[in-house]
Amino acid sequence: PTNYNPAADLVGALARPEGRNFATVYDPKKGRDDLGKVAELLRALHSYQGGPVVQAALKLAPIVFVRPGELRHARWADIDLDKAEWRYLASKTKQPHIVPLSSQAVEIFRELHPLTGRGQYVFPGARSRSRPMSENAVTAALRYMGYDGETMTGHGFRALARTVLDEVLSFRPDFIEHQLAHAVKDANGTAYNRTAHLPERQKMMQAWADYLDSLREGGNVVPLRRKAV
């Protein structure tokens, strides 16, 4: 039928958050009433006065919502700013993964490139540019801004995106799960490849970045209705 939605065949969508360390400021039980906390977090991230590498990581974390270790180990060789794509091997599934980059993400990468673009890592360590930044760098910045481990973690950006994209912006669960680099399978148990729904995911990632901008800027954000596509 023309109104068939393949998302209905997904096994276990949406997947449960990975591990215990996924505290995030947004409580889905409170719904849209809790989005003000997200706006406050985003404003704090953009006003952080630390070094430029950590600044860029903090701004990118909610936009791209990759795993914290994948963000830390981001390599310039894997990022194509002209195509607005970041391709790498997902740390958990060990499968090739594509992150479509919103215009906001591309801008952040371009601003950082003159500082770190000659090296291997997008976010090099403070002590050695041949190593990625410390796994505690983003956590320490969050603590400095007043967010403890029970309130917000580096992994919490994934939990935030997963919940808001689904429950507030109403994007299809399979689009979200693919973008989270979870091992998504259809009703036959066949895993989708990395390019599955890529055009739709590109639109979703741009809509997500635009939505976060609207929250941060205090605009009257109207949820999108896309799930029943």
Could you describe each region identified by the protein language model?
Residues 2-73, 82, 92-95, 115-117, ...:
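Basic, Lys/Arg- and aromatic-enriched nucleic-acid-binding interface segment
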Residues 3-4, 77-85, 149-151, 170-193, ...:
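Short, polar N-cap/turn motifs at the start of nucleic acid-interacting alpha helices
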Residues 10, 79, 88, 123, ...:
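Short clusters of hydrophobic/aromatic residues that line enzyme substrate/ligand-binding pockets
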Residues 14, 72, 78, 83, ...:
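Short, small-residue-rich loop/turn micro-motifs
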Residues 29-35, 107, 111-119, 124-132, ...:
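C-terminal secondary-structure termini that scaffold catalytic or DNA-interacting sites
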Residues 43-55, 64, 99, 107-130, ...:
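Short, basic (Lys/Arg/His-rich) helix/loop patches that form interaction surfaces
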Residues 85, 96-100:
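Well-ordered beta-strand positions in beta-sheet-rich domains
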